[in-house]
Amino acid sequence: MTSERLQKLMAAAGLGSRRACEELIRAGRVSVNGKPISLGEKADPRHDDIRVDGRPLAAAEQTMYLALHKPRGVVSSLEPQGDRQTVRDLVPGAARLFPVGRLDLESEGLILMTNDGELALRLTHPRYGCEKEYRVLLSRRPDEQQLEIWRRGVVLEGGLRTAPALVRVESPAGRGAWVRVVMGEGRKREIREIAMRLGLSVVRLQRIRIGSLLLGSLRPGQSRELTAAEARQLLASTHATQSPKLSRRPLVRAARPRVRQRQRE
């Protein structure tokens, strides 16, 4: 094995996504052969003594992938959040997994739980343009002008313009409407801020797809393990360069066996 960047080795050992591992390095919590290291340095785990917070770096783990349906009111975090339930509470037997594609507290839907730092990077970094698809319930139906502005990109606070997105009205819902949105980026609370800029209000937000992986028939709080073939297909979907497309059928079917569900107490 040749030398690898520290954040890659750390992610492979299940310490989190590459971005999270980079933050550990920046914070001075990582050393190689007794010396603090800087971001971008490399090491060989066969010969170098790599430590995080003074503890030896564990060997690379066998990769694991879980599709999880995060309910509303559950925090997309591994750390305790007072009395609030976290995604770790929903998959208590998968302590070394971390969430990829976080959702805010009031949003729901698909989250990937994994210890594969490389896949996590490809699913979340904007340069890979991995598609995420959402169903969004708006308090009132948007007009065509609002939809067109959303499709072209909306200027957010600070002057940042969002990337083009595929947006269409799916069905009416009283005075409001369900809207389908496909995006190649996913900044924190981006859809909610876009809606606010357009004079709209989000009532409900559900993510139904990440790359080739669909939420499928998973109910809130349930999770299922992906097969190796599904994981490879998901990784391959991060290389796609075609224009965003709305899903018409499951690309990864939600298998009924091996479904986990947190029992209510």
Task: Walk through the language-model features, giving the residues of each.
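Basic, flexible Lys/Arg- and Gly-enriched helix-loop patches that mediate nucleic-acid binding at interfaces
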Residues: M1-E265
